[in-house]
Structures are given as structure tokens and as C-alpha cells.
Amino acid sequence: MKTQRDGHSLGRWSLVLLLLGLVMPLAIVAQVLSYKEAVLRAIDGINQRSSDANLYRLLDLDPRPTMDGDPDTPKPVSFTVKETVCPRTTQQSPEDCDFKKDGLVKRCMGTVTLNQARGSFDISCDKDNKRFALLGDFFRKSKEKIGKEFKRIVQRIKDFLRNLVPRTES
């Protein structure tokens, strides 16, 4: 014969199981890395395996390809890393390190998974031609010069327009 107490106990267990069912998908979602986080984790692995003296840091990340929603499916990635001033033996994060002037640039391609618990990567990096690094520096410097010139032109236009306004004499 069931008692009222048994009914409350069964109701509590049902409630606990229902809450667990609602919370578990949230825990799984929280363990999925973003595309960039997965690439940064792969770069950490590259730095650990590297025999080079200094750490590498993300220089350029190619746009994220269209992907399925399964975090366990390997996702294609391609990015460029550049040598930093920080020695590989440091405990410092590569993101906190400045790029080394004329540092080695590597082009990396492969796959990463976004599952944080079982995250994996298969990346290979090739030394980029020096021309590529110089080209990147050229574009960066050109952008700075164009920005300065643009500001100067805007200021000259403003000055010209101010001079067009009729002046009233007091």
C-alpha cells in the first residue's frame, strides 16, 4: 500500500531528474569553444611542440568557413602566426607578447574540433616566404600613411569651408 510520503518522494525524484535533464544540455553547450578559441588552443600546442626559441602568436585568421553544429566534427582552419619576443620557456601567454621585428612568419592549415573536453587539432605550419611578411608590413604601413593623409585632407576641407562663410565685421 502506497503512502502519501512515498508519493512526495517520487515527485521529488521526478523533479530532480527533470532539472538535471534541463541543466545537462546547458553544461554541454558551455563546453564548446569558439572558432578563434580553438585556433588559439592549437597555437598553444604548436608552441609546445616547437623547437624554435620564441613563442608564436596569431597574426591573421582566415574567415571561418561554414560549419555544421557538431563540435566533435573536425573543422578546417587556416591562419598565420608570427614569432614573438617571448622565449618559449616563459609562462607568459603568447597574446601578451609583442611580435618580433622581422620575426619568422608561418602559414598554418589543418583542422580543429570545438569540443572543449575532447578538443583536438591537426595543424601543420610552413615557413612563409619573407616576401609575405614584408608584404604584410607594407600594407600595414600604407594603411597608416593613408589614414594620416586622409585626416590631413579632411582638415584642409574643413578649413576651406570655414573660409567660405561670410565674415561679419564688428
UniProtKB/Swiss-Prot annotation:
Location of this chain's protein in the cell: Secreted; Vesicle
Major subcellular location class: secreted
Stretch list, region Active core: 150-162
Cleaved propeptide residues: 31-131
Post-translational modification: Proteolytically cleaved by proteinase PRTN3 into antibacterial peptide LL-37. Proteolytically cleaved by cathepsin CTSG and neutrophil elastase ELANE.
Disulphide bonds in the chain: 86-97, 108-125
Pfam families: CAP18_C, Cathelicidins
Alphabetical list of InterPro entries matching this protein: Cathelicidin-like, Cathelicidin_CS, Cathlecidin_C, Cystatin_sf
A Gene Ontology biological process term: defense response to Gram-positive bacterium
GO cellular component, one term: vesicle
PROSITE patterns hit by this protein: CATHELICIDINS_1 (PS00946), CATHELICIDINS_2 (PS00947)
UniProt family annotation: Belongs to the cathelicidin family.
Known function: Antimicrobial protein that is an integral component of the innate immune system. Binds to bacterial lipopolysaccharides (LPS). Acts via neutrophil N-formyl peptide receptors to enhance the release of CXCL2. Postsecretory processing generates multiple cathelicidin antimicrobial peptides with various lengths which act as a topical antimicrobial defense in sweat on skin. The unprocessed precursor form, cathelicidin antimicrobial peptide, inhibits the growth of Gram-negative E.coli and E.aerogenes with efficiencies comparable to that of the mature peptide LL-37 (in vitro).
Protein name, UniProt field: Cathelicidin antimicrobial peptide
Gene name of this polypeptide: CAMP
